[in-house]
Design a protein with these regions (language model features):
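Gly/Ser/Thr-rich loops at beta-strand to alpha-helix junctions
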Residues: 79-81, 225-231
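Histidine/lysine/aspartate-rich catalytic loop segments that bind and position anionic ligands
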Residues: 162-214
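Short beta->alpha linker loops
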Residues: 182, 226, 285-287
């Protein structure tokens, strides 16, 4: 190759790389709360029917498409025993705690039906349920203690954990783990922000690093538990921060996510809402 031809050669190389960047789309996999406590297996605190099979299908998907997955993000529900959505936080007029799946409304707190067990937390707890109501968020629901930090229930489902580690080793990449839920004064369904953000706690505010990382992807595959709650809220918040033009990047792997029993309509409403905005839904086996 003569030196005189070098500028033309460099231009051709630059055009080739520009073309490759356009052709080689970045694909990210977002896995929401794939933890033992949400799987329908022995010992789970809050089992979601079908979740274990969801995670097994997802593990097979990761193994089958490892070379096509440029980044994997895994959110982890991470709670303390003492939490505003746990029974130990509240008592009735007789001093009894609520049973799991009790709904505590603003009117209930005003009427004295429920109060914070610790007197110092009463004003903030009352303000919390009021803010939920004003913002049109889910009503406060008392959940069984789940995904306690450091517990077996907090761990990732075993088949998926193996697949994630195989992906990391084969690609020489690090799985991006995103924790949420350790602030006891607010629920944190969404991995993007808490139900009622706490200005004094950055972990409850919009996770701009997470959003910015996802924004660099051309396609974001979504899976995890539960479709009705943490998946729905996370994806809605991602879409709100992306803008409508980028919602088309989102692809829900419909056979890798299930709703909490009794809340199936929330999951269905979420899918209807987001597909109308451009999100696609497909089976992991059709990818």
């Amino acid at each position: 190759l003569r030196l005189a031809n070098m500028p033309d050669t460099l231009r051709l190389v630059a055009k080739y790389h520009e073309h490759q960047e356009k052709v080689m789309k970045k694909t990210h996999l977002l896995i929401i709360d794939p933890q033992n406590d949400f799987c329908d297996i022995a010992g789970a605190a809050l089992p979601v029917a079908g979740a274990n099979a969801d995670m097994q299908r997802l593990a097979a998907f990761v193994d089958a498409h490892a070379a096509r997955l440029d980044d994997i993000h895994v959110t982890l529900d991470s709670h303390n025993p003492v939490d505003i959505a746990h029974a130990s936080w509240w008592v009735d007029s007789l001093g009894n705690p609520p049973v799991p799946f009790t709904v505590i409304s603003q009117d209930d707190v005003i009427a004295g039906k429920w109060r914070a067990r610790h007197p110092d937390a009463q004003a903030r707890s009352a303000a919390y349920v009021r803010q939920l109501s004003q913002a049109g968020r889910y009503a406060l629901l008392i959940w069984p203690e789940h995904c306690l930090i450091g517990s077996w229930g907090h761990n990732i489902q075993v088949d998926l954990m193996g697949a994630l580690n195989r992906w990391a080793r084969s690609r020489m990449e690090i799985v991006d783990y995103v924790t949420k839920g350790s602030n006891p004064f607010t629920e944190h369904y969404s991995a993007v922000k808490a139900e009622v953000p706490d200005a004094a706690d950055p972990s409850t505010l919009v996770n701009t690093r997470f959003i910015d990382t996802l924004a660099r992807a051309d396609q974001i595959l979504i899976a995890g538990e539960a479709l009705s709650h943490c998946v729905a809220n996370t994806v809605r918040d991602i879409a709100a921060n992306f803008g409508d033009d980028n919602v088309r990047k989102l692809v829900l792997l419909g056979d890798c996510s299930s709703s909490v029993a009794g809340f199936e309509s929330l999951g269905a409403d979420f899918v209807t809402e987001m597909t109308a905005r451009g999100m696609r839904v497909m089976k992991s086996t059709d990818y």
